[in-house]
């Protein structure tokens, strides 16, 4: 990238006026547009990231030209790829490869001045005439800045650079108008709290509280995508706290604010919500690098940490002596997790994995009191399957006791169990464990046709294999016949 001294508008904070790196491809595109007497400006996230000294991998531009006018220019520039899925919104995209093999992707949109239907967040697309008018329809001032190319004039009509320097999220126009036009902007606000560590300006925050119910018109997929981006950020806790405080969570993840009403059974935390936030942070800290078993950021682990205790409100019971219990909250929580993630249209594989982690998150606790037999360890690994590494991290993250002795006992037990698993894996491949007699042999030995009894017999023999390890085939056959005589012939 090339380094330039930008020409700043008067409203730009002195704290952010310095040298910035600009993609040479942006300058080149600007010259191509200028030759045809069209305006072109880098806008939104790439400009914000430039001021934060972050690298943007995709470049967004807006222009005075209509799509049919700038399409030939873009096709000529982006000789390695072109797409027009956003044509009806005035957007075309292109890609080119550099000599080093890296790709530069750009999307260019005609200036917009949209009209919104109050019953939908989808605007009636109308083209605008000025860059400033286009910037006024953007979500927040920190995203309503532009850099004209090729002359590198910085355009900031709403004080976005100043807000960026202060770490504040504010809308370019009245926040109620902005959120009424596009309610998803409220979700984007809390997502930026997580991604950028910003705070929401008071008037903007008040508008979110008042208008959270407008999110009801937003599709589940859009809500899911914002939640995902927030959870995969560096500071998801800040975003989740803003989600709850603003009332948005009540509309999109009601199980989370419900945790604020529940007192932790050990009275270690202000409420279960606080405990959940701590578990999430601890789980993130246990993620690995890209070469490890749980590469960061891991959406499955983070969702499981967020949802692992949502069954507590429905299972709360007041015991003698003022104690509170939440028996079977793991099972209840797993059912609630599946229902919520399905409502948000998450991928079914992810739903299965997160649900199973919530279901199993208490499984290890019995080991602390009394170490398991080898068969119990095998069963733990077999039952957790491909989620074994994630389950161990969720289990460790969930151990938030402030009692130093208990904490050390738990960590020692977890370390011991993991070492035992390593030793047992040297003896056999847990993922390949099967009964010593398969389904076909079961039917042959017991003279059965395919049916439920064959399935029950297979499950029994798998349990027997887990409990006893590998045994001689004759012993396995004897066990099968014994089980059949005692269970099915009574």
Which stretches of residues belong to each language-model region?
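Catalytic cores of the polymerase beta-like nucleotidyltransferase superfamily
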Residues: 1-490
């Amino acid at each position: 990238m090339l380094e330039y001294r930008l020409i700043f508008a008067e409203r730009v904070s002195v704290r952010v006026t310095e040298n910035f790196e600009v993609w040479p491809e942006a300058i080149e595109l600007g010259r191509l547009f200028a030759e045809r007497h069209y305006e072109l400006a880098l806008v939104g996230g790439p400009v914000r990231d430039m001021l934060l000294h972050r690298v943007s991998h995709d470049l967004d531009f807006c222009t005075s030209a209509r799509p049919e006018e700038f399409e030939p220019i873009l096709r000529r520039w982006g000789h390695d790829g072109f797409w027009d899925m956003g044509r009806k919104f005035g957007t075309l995209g292109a890609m080119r490869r550099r000599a080093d093999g890296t790709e530069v992707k750009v999307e260019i949109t005609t200036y917009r001045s949209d009209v919104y239907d109050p019953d939908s967040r989808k605007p009636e697309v109308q083209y605008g005439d000025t860059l400033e008018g286009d910037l006024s329809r953007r979500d927040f001032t920190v995203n309503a800045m532009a850099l004209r190319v090729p002359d590198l004039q910085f355009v900031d009509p709403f004080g976005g650079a100043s807000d960026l320097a202060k770490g504040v999220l504010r809308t370019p126009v009245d926040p109620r108008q902005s959120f009424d036009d596009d309610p998803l902007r409220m979700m984007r606000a809390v997502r930026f709290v997580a991604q950028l560590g910003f705070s929401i300006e008071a008037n903007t925050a008040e508008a979110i509280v008042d208008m959270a119910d407008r999110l009801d018109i937003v599709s589940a997929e859009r809500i899911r995508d914002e939640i995902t981006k927030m959870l995969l950020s560096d500071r998801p806790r800040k975003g989740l706290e803003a989600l709850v405080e603003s009332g948005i969570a009540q509309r999109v993840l009601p199980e989370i604010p419900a945790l604020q009403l529940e007192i932790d059974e050990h009275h270690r935390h202000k409420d279960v919500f606080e405990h959940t936030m701590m578990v999430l942070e601890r789980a993130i800290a246990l993620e690995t690098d890209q070469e490890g078993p749980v590469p960061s950021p891991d959406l499955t682990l983070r969702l499981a940490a967020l949802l692992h205790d949502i069954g507590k409100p429905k299972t709360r019971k007041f015991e003698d002596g003022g104690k509170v219990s939440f028996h079977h909250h793991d099972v209840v929580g797993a059912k609630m997790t599946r229902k919520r993630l399905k409502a948000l249209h998450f991928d079914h594989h992810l739903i299965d994995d997160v649900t199973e982690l919530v279901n199993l998150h208490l499984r290890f606790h019995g080991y602390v009191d009394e170490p398991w037999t080898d068969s119990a360890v095998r069963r733990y690994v077999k039952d957790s399957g491909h989620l074994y590494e994630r389950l161990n991290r969720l289990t460790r993250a969930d151990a938030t006791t402030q009692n130093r002795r208990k904490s050390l006992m738990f960590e020692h037990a977890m370390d011991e169990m993991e070492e035992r698993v390593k030793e047992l894996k040297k003896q056999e491949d847990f993922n390949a464990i099967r009964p010593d007699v398969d389904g076909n042999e079961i039917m042959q030995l017991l003279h059965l046709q395919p049916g439920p009894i064959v399935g029950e017999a297979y499950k029994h023999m798998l349990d027997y294999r887990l409990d006893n390890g590998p045994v001689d085939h004759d012993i396995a056959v004897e066990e099968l016949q014994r089980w059949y005589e005692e269970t099915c012939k009574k």
